[in-house]
Regions:
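Pre-ATPase regulatory/linker segments immediately N-terminal to the P-loop/RecA-like helicase/translocase core
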Residues: 1-75, 126-130, 138, 145-155
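Conserved P-loop NTPase motor core of helicases/translocases
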Residues: 9-15, 53-56, 104-198
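Motif I (Walker A/P-loop) of helicase-class P-loop NTPases
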Residues: 91-100, 209
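Pre-Walker A (Motif I) flank of P-loop NTPase domains
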Residues: 76-82, 108-109
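Walker A (P-loop) phosphate-binding loop of P-loop NTPases
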Residues: 87
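Residues at the beta-strand->loop junction immediately N-terminal to the Walker
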Residues: 83-84, 114
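SF2 helicase catalytic motif II
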Residues: 192-211
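Acidic, Ser/Thr-rich intrinsically disordered and amphipathic helical segments
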Residues: 68-69, 81, 93, 120-123, ...
Length: 214
């Protein structure tokens, strides 16, 4: 496989007269993340499972009567759905407003921003860059727009990073970005950092098993 090529060409010598075929190799990261996410869901506390199975209403702060979308979303205790046609500013304006509002709520707040595709995550990174909001992106450099590769975690920590410096970098960065598949496959992130708010952009396009355990 090109992703993890055979390093010892001597393996092929006994079969040098054979014919070979090149085929697509489907990685198991996405499938494994789905299974892991489902496991997290079925082992989660019953109130959480009841919420996602529509067995109870999502909770919100009853004191908030504001018609402002940001105030209503940030007052939600379980989840808040923002629905709108493409091109109506859900990422460029609404998401930015939510991020800025949560960060302004206190220095102890931190956010996890996700989407299904790397292209959509690029859009989130573009919004954060325009808003001058510091962030780290978890993911592969091969699937990240060159404009944002300096904010990839692997690049930000440098070549001489230690476990302590990596923990400090995560602790000191209030916004973490990645695809749902990548974040699901890096569960150690949740043992190193606690998030006050998670936002999934374009969530309606994502199969439930990809996000039900996040």
């Amino acid at each position: 496989a090109l992703a993890d090529g055979q390093q010892n060409d001597a393996v092929l010598v006994p079969h040098s007269d054979a014919a070979y075929a090149v085929e697509h190799s489907a990685g198991d990261l996405s499938q494994g993340s789905k299974i892991h996410s489902l496991h997290n869901f079925i082992t989660a506390p019953k109130p959480f499972r009841d919420l996602l199975l529509a067995q109870r209403e999502p909770l919100a702060d009853s004191n908030v009567k504001d018609d402002d979308m940001t105030a209503r979303a940030l007052s939600s205790k379980d989840y808040f759905l923002l629905v709108g046609p493409p091109g109506t500013g859900k990422t460029s304006r609404a998401l930015r407003s939510l991020v800025e509002g949560e960060l302004a709520a206190g220095c102890e707040t931190s956010l996890l921003l996700m989407s299904y595709t790397n292209r959509a995550v690029d859009e989130i990174c573009s919004m954060l860059k325009d808003a001058a909001i510091d962030y780290l992106r978890i993911g592969s450099p091969y699937r990240c727009d060159p404009r944002f590769q300096d904010r990839l975690f692997a690049n930000a920590i440098g070549d001489d990073a230690t476990l302590t410096s990596m923990k400090q970098l995560l602790a000191g960065t209030r916004v973490i970005v990645g695809t749902t598949t990548t974040i699901s496959s890096h569960e150690e992130l949740f043992s190193l950092k606690r998030f006050s708010l998670a936002i999934i952009d374009e969530a309606s396009q994502i199969p439930e098993p990809d996000i039900v355990g996040l």
